[in-house]
């Protein structure tokens, strides 16, 4: 499972004219589910993201988590995080989980975040979305549950 985690002052997802997810300060997480992923991958990333210390404390040091900072997380499915661009000019997506499996693990990730006490909002799985991300910093991190990077 892969996640691009962006610290934001605001995040909004719309589908057509409908706003389906919106947060103030916190994280926008673009989440990709891999073919080999399990619920353990969802649990690992949820715990890691909930406790990442990338928010400033009273001394300006990046020492607080989204939980400690009172933030929220907007989760957006993003199968293209498993795109393989090593050959040719068109990415291959064979490493991404099939949609019926990916939606289960995406939902598990969101459930795990919420169980840790993180307020969450979501995009809409397998829909064309417009995502507004107002970066704060910017602070952007790339995480992989298999610790590949």
Swiss-Prot record:
Pfam families: Tyr_Deacylase (PF02580). Belongs to the DTD family. Homodimer. This is D-aminoacyl-tRNA deacylase. A Gly-cisPro motif from one monomer fits into the active site of the other monomer to allow specific chiral rejection of L-amino acids. It comes from Desulforudis audaxviator (strain MP104C). A motif (Gly-cisPro motif, important for rejection of L-amino acids) lies at residues 137-138. Its main location: cytoplasm. Its EC number is 3.1.1.96. GO terms for cellular component: cytoplasm. PANTHER family: D-AMINOACYL-TRNA DEACYLASE 1, D-TYROSYL-TRNA TYR DEACYLASE. The gene is dtd. It is found in: Cytoplasm.
């Amino acid at each position: 499972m892969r996640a691009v985690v962006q610290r934001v002052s605001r995040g909004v997802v719309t589908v057509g004219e409908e706003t389906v997810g919106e947060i103030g300060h916190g994280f926008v997480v673009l989440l990709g589910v891999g073919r080999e992923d399990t619920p353990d991958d969802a649990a690992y990333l949820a715990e890691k993201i909930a406790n990442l210390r990338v928010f400033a404390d009273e001394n300006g040091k990046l020492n607080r988590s989204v939980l400690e900072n009172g933030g929220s997380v907007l989760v957006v499915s993003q199968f293209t995080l498993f795109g393989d661009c090593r050959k040719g000019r068109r990415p291959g997506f064979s490493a991404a989980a099939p949609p019926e499996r990916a939606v289960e693990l995406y939902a598990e990730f969101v459930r795990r975040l919420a169980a840790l006490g993180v307020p969450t909002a979501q995009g809409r799985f397998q829909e064309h979305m417009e995502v507004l991300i107002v970066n704060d910093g910017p602070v952007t991190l790339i995480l992989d549950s298999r610790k590949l990077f």
